[in-house]
Amino acid sequence: GRIDVFLNDDKTVIFRDNGIGLKEEEVYRFLTVIGESSKRDTPDADDFIGRFGIGLLSCFVVTDEIKVESRSAMGGQAVCWCGKVDGTYELTSSAEERPIGSQVVLHPKNDWMHLFEYDTFKKILVGYGEVLPYPVYLHHQDEEELVNTPSPVWLAPKATRKELLDYGAKVFQSSALDVFRIRTESGRVEGVLYVLPFRTQFSVRNSHKVYLKRMLLSEDDCNLLPQWAFFIRCLVNADGLLSTASRESLVSNDLLKDARKEIGMAIKDYLRGLVQNNRAMFNKILDVHHFHIKAIASEDNELLRLFMDYLPFETNKGVRSFGSIRSADNVICYTRNLEDFRQVRRIAGAQGWLVVNAAYTFDETLLKKYARLNPELTLDEI
């Protein structure tokens, strides 16, 4: 199959495919109830037409008329559905010979002509359709150009780490510390996650790319990432999740929740693997993202045991790993607020004590949870 997009000099646009087309009965069933498909928020809506309704309706933002012409591979005459912005439509059939498949014809309003300038139009077309599984050709002034990559490197099983890092740097205009693959059963999410090379705050929204059935959905993470995963940038495609009616995000349901849980486990498995097999990379990530690693460890006892010795804590003798703090004494002295720490640090230094400043987010929680898991340790709050 293929998709051909024709941008004419008068800015008329034709989207044409060589698919199986629609019979008159199917045109009537689907197009005359155009809003219906956008309201079906169940997997049953995942049929061969798909959830196209709101997408076709959105054409009325830039045009007063939508024309759909189709001829079915199952036989019958070609049909033409012409919808008007006032809600009326006309459905006709034609004995005229036309190729099997469908095409959508749009005549843009004057106010939106700027979107149909060649460079702007091509940028939008590439942005949304770059990884569609069928070749997309843009035709303009007798020239034809392939504008997508049906087999993108980030979905290629044999792509190397360098290829994935180079692709991410090109797409996001930023390098990454590392990259790893994910695949979920829930929602059939597949792609790669990049580890950001700079510190991030929980309130900052990073740039992502989320595709739904290989078409760009959003540059937000669409709630696919756990709340603590702000050090991760995702480049993923979901074949089994549902979009909202506006096609700006994913429907928040149990399927999305399960997919997010699987992605969270994949991130934890990745970090666990680094601790066991690539300590140098783990240390690089820890240097930049120790705050987020602490957040992960605070909610997962297994990872707490695995990560705790490597996590940095401020003490009156400088920043030290918990492993070095623990090796100094089985009694760990700490303060729970910054003012107390400032008051005792000089006295503690003179007495030769090691005192942890646990005023930072997660630090006291981590100390208490680790002590509960390791009875040989004693916490002494000063």
Region spans (language model):
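GHKL (Bergerat-fold) ATPase N-terminal catalytic module, capturing the glycine-rich phosphate-binding loop
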Residues: 1-115, 316
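GHKL/Bergerat-fold ATPase module in large chromosome/replication-associated machines
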Residues: 48, 67-90, 109-114, 119-382
